[in-house]
Amino acid sequence: MDAAKYILIICYLLQTLLPLQISLATDSQNEAEDSEEDVSSIIAKLNKGQTCFWPKSSSGIVTVPYTLSVDYTSTDSAIIYSAIQEYTSLTCIRFVERKTETDYIQIQSVDGCWSYLGRIGGSQVLSLLNPGCVLKGIVQHELNHVLGFVHEHTRSDRDTYVYMEWANIPDVYKSNFEMTQPATNNMGLPYDYSSVMHYGRYAFSNAPGKATIVPKPDPSVPIGQRYGLSALDLQKINRLYQCDVCSSLLFDPSGYLNSGYAQSANQNRSQCVWLIRIPTNKVFLQFQSFDPSPGCISDSVKVYDGAGKMSPLLINTTCGMKKLPPVMSSGNLMFVEFLSGGASTFTASYQTVACGGMQTKLNGTVTSPGYPTKYLPSTDCIWSIVAPSGNRVQLNFISFALESSRNCVYDYLSISDSSRSGTSVSDKYCGAKNMPPLVSSGNWVLLKFHSDIVRRWMETNDLGTDYTLFFTTERI
């Protein structure tokens, strides 16, 4: 079934279904619970004579104008903007502040979390009740309804993947679980238990602990997350609106980026992007290679501290740099943009880091975790110190007292730069000593601190268990 037929299906839904409303999220947004309401009066306001998809410009951009109620706090607004930013970064959808457009959405705190399906013509309300609905995944759920998407658990092949416990669903809410008619066009994509459009296991249950939706064949599969759009959610948006983009969402706690893979799947792409969105803590990104194409003049890798290009820039690396500095985000989001006019490639890996950070100032201080108190066992911290291009980093230690062991196999501080891998014994330091000044060969230094699970050094040492260093930068 082609996209045109899918438009007819969605428009049919607009004429026959009540507005869908997302339930609130609990348990750290892992499950969606029952707070939706059916608002039958809204269906009478639908303009049935208009197409329900938002139009696409000749440049390939789909614009959805919106207004945002002044009733939201600055914190609420920041959450909504962050949710919107992911569409901008990874699709051809652009939610933009309304100027004089006739068709637009009004984001307001009305009476729950709900939205019309698709574009209905004129102004249309998207309700995000505050408090309760202003969470990133809930905002994106409702924005997906605006784009024309129904709930994942109502798609026409759902009986293969989930079982509805009808006895646990009150009659007034059973319409929210009925399979979509006519049959949905799933665009050749698999059923998505992790979709932001999927209800939670206990949504609308008539009794605590009684499930209304059970995955099969494995009933333990998580459903109903409200962290944000899934990778398949984004694929559906890009296929439905025929977005000509090269983008990927990475959401595992660790993983890899490979521009060669992206380019092989998207020939002749001049731009590919990755959004790394880990569940918690910070993203640490380390490049294994950067191979500019012969004669390149503008190929680059840009890394942003957030969900897109409106976020602070962490690095902007072009052809002339062979060794890219390791970078760390301030939160759980990092955006990577690769621009190439030829055959340039890069490979990188990322991981979740709970302790550490990135320093880009001309000077500063780095200390052991918990300083001036003793650091805890089973602790890992990473610090990336990056100086401006053409500069180098000097480390001057004020104090250094870690557990001593042969080859520093217990507690240690490893120090590496662009000339060293950071894995050899000579890069690890431990014990109590006067550390000499260390100078990098390039413009960055990577510090990795590790303490093992045993507290033997901390219990017997009278010298203290910490390190403190002052770093400066200077022209090479």
Listing of model-derived features with the role each one plays in the protein:
Residues 3-6, 25, 231, 240-476:
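Domain-level representation of secreted and single-pass membrane ectodomains enriched
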Residues 42-48, 52, 56-60, 67-202:
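Metzincin-family zinc-dependent endopeptidase catalytic domain
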Residues 55-56, 171-253:
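Extracellular (secreted or membrane-anchored) zinc-dependent metallopeptidases
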Residues 66-70, 128-130, 287, 399, ...:
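Short glycine-centered, acidic/aromatic-flanked micro-motifs in structured strand/loop junctions
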